[in-house]
Amino acid sequence: MSESSATPGAAATPPRPAFVPKPPLLAAAYMLASTFIALSQSLGQGFLSANLTTLGGELGATQSETMWLMVVFMAPRAVLPLMLIKIRMQFGLRRFAEVSIIVYVAVALLSLLATDLRSALVVELLSGIAAAPLSTLAFLYMLEPLPPEKKLTIGLPLALTMISLGTPLARAINPLILTDGSWTNILMLKLGMSMICLVLVYRLPLVAAETMKVIKGMDLVSFGLIAASFGGFVACFTTGATYWWVEVPWLGQAIAASIAALVLALVIELHRRTPLLDVRWLTSPAMLHLTAALLIFRIILSEQSSGAPGLFQTLGFAQEQVAPLFWAIAAATLGGGIACALVL
C-alpha cells in the first residue's frame, strides 16, 4: 500500500510569495468579495433547506423523495475539500479560482432547466460539487489582504461568520423572494450572485503561488473510498428521520458499508508516505481538541437549520411568521463574528 516513489514532505505546501500590503480600498474590495462569495455559497444551501416542502410540490415528489436533493447537494461538499487542497497546490490558486467560479456559473444556468425530480437531483449534485470550492475561495479572499499576524485572528473569524450567515439569512429573506411561490425566483437570484462572483474573481485575482505535482495515483483510490463513506453517512443521517431508522434495512447496511470503506481508506493512508489524509496528525491531542470544539459548534448551529424550523413547521407557523426570528439570528451571528475578530 505504500508509495515507494514518494518522499517525505513531497506534499508540503508550496512557499507563498512575500506579503505585500494592499491599498485600503483594494483590501476592502477583497474582503467584500470574500463576503459575497461566502454568502452566494451558503445562501444556496439555506434556500434548499428552507424550501424542500415547496420543491416537492413543484417537482411532483414526496417529502422523502425531496430529502434526496439535500443528500446529493451535501455529499460532495463533505468530501471534496480533501482533494481541493492538492488540486489547488498542483494547478495554482488563480487557475483554481477561475475554473471554480466558471463551473459555479454554468451549474447555476443549468439549474434553470430542471423540471422534475430526476433532473433536479442531477442539478443539485452538480451544485454541491460546484459550491464546494467557494468556501475555500471565501477564506482565501478574506485572508489575501491581511498581514500574516492578522490572518487567523481577523480573517478566519470573519470568513467563518459570512459562511455561517447564509443559513439564517436565507430563511429570513425567503418569504420576500418567494412572493409567487415559484422556485425560479431563487434560481435567478443564485444565477445573478454567481455572475457577480465571476466578475469579482476575475477583477480581483489572488496572488499566484508556486505549483508542484502532489496528486498521486493512490490519492484517487483513497478519495474514492472516503467519498463513498461520507456519501453513505450523509444519506443515512439526512434521510434517517424521514424513513425512520428501524423501518428500512438499507439504512443499517449503508452505515456498515460506509464504516468499512472509511476503515479501508484509513489503513491505506496510514501506510503512505505522502497521504491524502494525515491520520496521525488528525489524531494528535491538539487536533482532537479542535475537532471536539468544532463538533459542539456544529451541533449548536444545527438548531438554526433543522431544530427550530422543524418545530415551527410542526406547530403550523408560516415562513413569514418566523422570518423575524431568523433576522435576529442573522444579526447575532454577524455581531458575534465581528466581536470575535475584535477580541482575538
Predicted feature residues:
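Cytosolic juxtamembrane N-terminal segment immediately preceding the first transmembrane helix
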Residues: 1-43, 57
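Extracellular/periplasmic helix-loop-helix junction of adjacent transmembrane segments
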Residues: 49-79, 119
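Helix-loop-helix hairpins in multi-pass membrane proteins, especially solute transporters
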Residues: 85, 89-217
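Central cavity-lining transmembrane alpha-helices of secondary-active solute carriers
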Residues: 70-86, 135-140, 327-339
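12-transmembrane solute porter fold
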Residues: 27-44, 48-52, 63, 107, ...
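Small-residue hotspots at the loop-to-helix junctions and early N-terminal turns
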Residues: 56, 60-67, 153, 157, ...
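Membrane-interface helix termini in secondary transporters
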Residues: 54, 82-86, 176, 342
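Hydrophobic transmembrane-helix bundles of small-molecule transporters
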Residues: 163, 175, 179-292
